[in-house]
Amino acid sequence: MGSGEPNPAGKKKKYLKAALYVGDLDPDVTEDMLYKKFRPAGPLRFTRICRDPVTRSPLGYGYVNFRFPADAEWALNTMNFDLINGKPFRLMWSQPDDRLRKSGVGNIFIKNLDKSIDNRALFYLFSAFGNILSCKVVCDDNGSKGYAYVHFDSLAAANRAIWHMNGVRLNNRQVYVGRFKFPEERAAEVRTRDRATFTNVFVKNIGDDIDDEKLKELFCEYGPTESVKVIRDASGKSKGFGFVRYETHEAAQKAVLDLHGKSIDGKVLYVGRAQKKIERLAELRRRFERLRLKEKSRPPGVPIYIKNLDETINDEKLKEEFSSFGSISRAKVMMEVGQGKGFGVVCFSSFEEATKAVDEMNGRIVGSKPLHVTLGQARRRC
């Protein structure tokens, strides 16, 4: 790999610094272990393990700063995917200017990968097409999830990879290789496509007495339905919303146009196209961005608000319920005379974590009640 630092136009310039990013680190790896691993490559200025600002737990990546760029380049070319604590790490040039990464230029997406293809194999498969800034197979506790990202230093290299690799069979699986798209772009494509073809209708603000049959009676006059379902909690009580799937797009569109805003038993219905998860996440992201722009400075935490909490839920239990979604700086149940008031707040370190928590936990039964979870307005203190 060359020693030039790429820019979005695909041109190279000398790296001004000799720093490497080290990813996929075992949680027990320390700065001293990094130093001992990379010192044979050349004199070092320092090593650093990045940690959560609140919990101080390691984030799984760090940096190695060499004195000389040539030594950093040698380490990058010869030590990538070596082991520390029995786990292979990923190396790439540290990029203080993140405009290239945020632009998406040169970034490609690969899916339908065989589980045997790891980061090392991915790197060597695609390095023939140009200089790779980073590559990563997305994994969970069970291993590869079957998709990955490769970021080249130029659009030309990315296009070469797409041209040569899209549709190729790797380990008897035909892979898809295409341009990386940000969630907002993918959501816009889904909206455009689904608005012209949707058959699934989302209905909310329906009365407790509305069951599947009554909902079907209300919607069947617009066309034949494939399924009608009122969503209920574990006790069988209606959650106030449901779905109607029609056989044709025309019937679904007519129902939306005619029934949206109509009053049924004193309740004004919301009737619209059922959105896919990617669209809901994109909408939450747009809403957050609008709120964030109103703030004078970027907040240190992203809050979500939880209503309808069971009386048995305290601060510790609230944090436990949401901890799987990311790093929590604060979890608080509002109290009155020693008893919970039925609502609380949880603050995450990033918007992505908060959004995931809202999407997964809204409507989930905790204790004996379904939670109502919403994204809060970012504040200076969370």
UniProtKB/Swiss-Prot annotation:
Keywords: Cytoplasm, Mitochondrion, Repeat, RNA-binding. The keyword Nuclease does not apply. Transmembrane segments: none annotated. Expressed in fetal brain and in a range of adult tissues. It is found in: Cytoplasm. GO terms for cellular component: cytoplasmic stress granule; cytosol; mitochondrial matrix; nucleus; ribonucleoprotein complex. GO terms for molecular function: mRNA 3'-UTR binding; poly(A) binding; poly(U) RNA binding. Residues 18-96, 106-182, 199-276, 302-378 form the RRM domain. The keyword Repeat applies. Binds the poly(A) tail of mRNA. May be involved in cytoplasmic regulatory processes of mRNA metabolism. Can probably bind to cytoplasmic RNA sequences other than poly(A) in vivo. PANTHER family: RNA BINDING PROTEIN. This is Polyadenylate-binding protein 5. It comes from Homo sapiens (Human).
